[in-house]
């Protein structure tokens, strides 16, 4: 069953024992973020968290860590909670091929129950805001989806973007938003500012898990997140029309904020503890003016803790980064077998491939760095043979330790682009990139002595299946 809203997803998590309801009174700071942080430190299978007794807030409901374990991620895809990670990614890939599935426009969204306009807006009254890390410069919306359109082609449904961007709440109806240059919203903003125009946006909070996953997925510029959400949930994704902008927004959201990114206006935003596990510091960022708020009665506020991995954002971004990189590489290089870009939104990628000829694996690694996502993220690539599973780190370490000769297997590319949030970049946004070729050399690259590999015995696969069945029967 596909989830049309956050509430049905929370119910499914609860039904599977993956929602922990905390009824005791807690402090907004530091308890909410600290509890979410702790879910990444207590082992596999961490639950989502629900708080409804928060000191200082009246009738507030906060959900955290909803996708913050492989069990929760599986449930979001309507898979059994115990589905292995690799099978979840394989299913993601299978459903990807359903694209596009046209969305379903619905009337009477629950978020239309209450509205506030103009100077009457006070986000501090509507949202139970709290800091996520003690060095953050303010309150942040970090799991909301932002909808924008191409100002030069506003009726092109595919060019309408749905993405997750951090936003600092700076006033009653004022936000600071960080449009990463490699992301579609930055291109929309650039086009608007060239014309001297504000960029209208709609911000959706408290969303179903599939559109949240899509907001973190690097699609091509003209691929619709709503059509891909339909493919991923295997049914048309429900949308509704936002009343002020006329944009397409999720039908099941808890809160809709509408307004504009003000043209050519920048103010200091940050610091903020980022997915890189480091604070990003303060920078001049865009300013958002909110002109209309629509929200459900008793809305659920959802936030996401992020810091040193693993936290919820790693579960959210991991498969959502692997799959598009795999699909884009596979389309050009059918030899590619698998892509593991689970680490820090793909700043590191491990790619397995067959090889046509010597040097082929390095060409694949270079192409990974020049995909739409790779331009801003893929900083290091480890290339491995087709018989090495990039999701099996012991196998990857074996390939690195036995097949890499630093004299010829390291390719360093100077002065390449990367997102400014990468703490290793210097200056911010510029870095050297590295390809590590841990594949077996093939002609005409005849280095090394790899003619006598030890392979699994022919009967090993059958015995593995037999032992697995015996263990399952014993349990």
Language model feature labels by segment:
Residues 1-272, 277-287, 291-475:
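Extended, highly charged
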